[in-house]
A protein has these predicted regions:
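Terminal amphipathic alpha-helical/low-complexity segments used for targeting or macromolecular assembly
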Residues: 1-71, 75
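Structural signal for interior beta-strand "rungs" in well-ordered beta-sheet cores
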Residues: 72-113
């Protein structure tokens, strides 16, 4: 699970690109990279999770929770910063999705809701 991505710009950009490609591959409604980048709340929640998870693992638990709650308000998707999520994760129709503190999600998982 990616915990050191923020400290390495190359790794962070690689993961962002991979996340966008994951959406393009798994969602037939996704047309362009710019659309995915700007208009996919599941992706925004995932990126926020990645950063809050990084903060959580470095002891900034309150900051991580505040970020997590802010993104929940904006996207309707709640991912606890202590959850463990592998690469290739895609949330489709994410409104109301809750991923708790003890959740472990492996690589290349697609989550449908509704």
């Amino acid at each position: 699970m990616e915990t050191d991505i923020i400290g390495n710009r190359t790794s962070l950009l690689r993961i962002i690109r991979a996340d966008i490609e994951t959406v393009l591959q798994r969602d037939p409604a996704a047309r362009t990279r710019i659309e995915v980048l700007l208009a996919y709340p599941g992706l925004h929640a995932l990126w926020s999770y990645r950063f809050s998870h990084f903060l959580w693992n470095r002891g900034s638990k309150l900051t991580a929770r505040i970020l997590s709650n802010t993104i929940r308000f904006l996207t309707g998707i709640e991912i606890h910063p202590a959850a463990r999520i592998g690469t290739g994760f895609f949330i489709d129709h994410g409104m109301g999705v809750v991923i708790g503190e003890t959740a472990i999600i492996g690589k290349n998982v697609t989550l449908y809701h509704g």
